[in-house]
Design a protein with these regions (language model features):
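Hydrophobic/aromatic beta-strand elements that line small-molecule binding cavities or substrate pockets
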Residues: 71-75, 100, 123, 137
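Anionic N-terminal interaction surfaces
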Residues: 2-78
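Short, surface-exposed beta-strand/loop "edge" segments at domain boundaries and coil↔beta transitions
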Residues: 56, 63-64, 82-83, 89-92, ...
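Generic detection of short hydrophobic beta-strand segments and adjacent strand-loop junctions
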Residues: 48-51, 100-102, 134-139
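Phosphoinositide-binding peripheral membrane targeting modules
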Residues: 66, 78-122
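Short, mixed charged/polar active-site loops
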Residues: 71, 95-99, 130-134
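Eukaryotic phosphoinositide-binding membrane-targeting regions
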Residues: 46, 53-55, 140-143, 148-152
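Canonical phosphoinositide-binding patch of PH/PH-like domains
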Residues: 125-148
């Protein structure tokens, strides 16, 4: 047992560093794979864009508790509503069902709710597979986003 303690004391930093590099590499490679769906965004047709928003999907028990906090990039083009995030957190956002490309014609309803400390925008939409989802967004300009999205409902 003494030998294990000496070994751990001597090599703990290198073990920790190796695990950190493995985790970092995993998140980057998975993030690149997940973000391939956003490669062809035409940035000349952006109507609205906001970084550092928060949100979560209300569909399953697991995703009600999980979401993204201050890492969501919301983009509205003339044809799509896009939720994406940066490379490092893309895998986590994908696992929490927060990466979407929604044609504006698939948006069914938006609802603005003013809270005590912040406001929330509920966006109900139909996925490509026909499922209905609701995303709750917390951003700086929820009313502006709602007015843009209401034009397409």
């Amino acid at each position: 047992m003494e030998y294990f303690g000496e070994f751990l004391g001597k090599y703990l930093f290198y073990i920790w560093l190796g695990l950190a590099i493995l985790l970092f590499t995993f998140l980057i490679t998975r993030g690149k794979k997940v973000l391939k769906q956003f490669v062809d965004i035409d940035f000349n047709k952006i109507v609205y864009s906001e970084k550092n928003a928060s949100g979560h999907v209300v569909r399953q028990t697991q995703t009600r508790r999980a979401g993204t906090t201050k890492m969501l990039h919301i983009i509205i083009t003339d044809q799509e509503l896009i939720f994406k995030t940066n490379l490092f957190f893309a895998h986590i956002a994908h696992e929490n069902d927060m990466l979407h490309r929604i044609p504006l014609g698939n948006i069914m309803q938006t609802e603005f709710k003013k809270g005590r400390f912040s406001s929330k925008l509920y966006v109900k939409f139909r996925t490509i597979h026909g499922d209905e989802k609701v995303v709750i967004l917390q951003s700086k300009n929820n009313l502006r986003m709602q007015s843009i999205l209401e034009q397409y409902i």
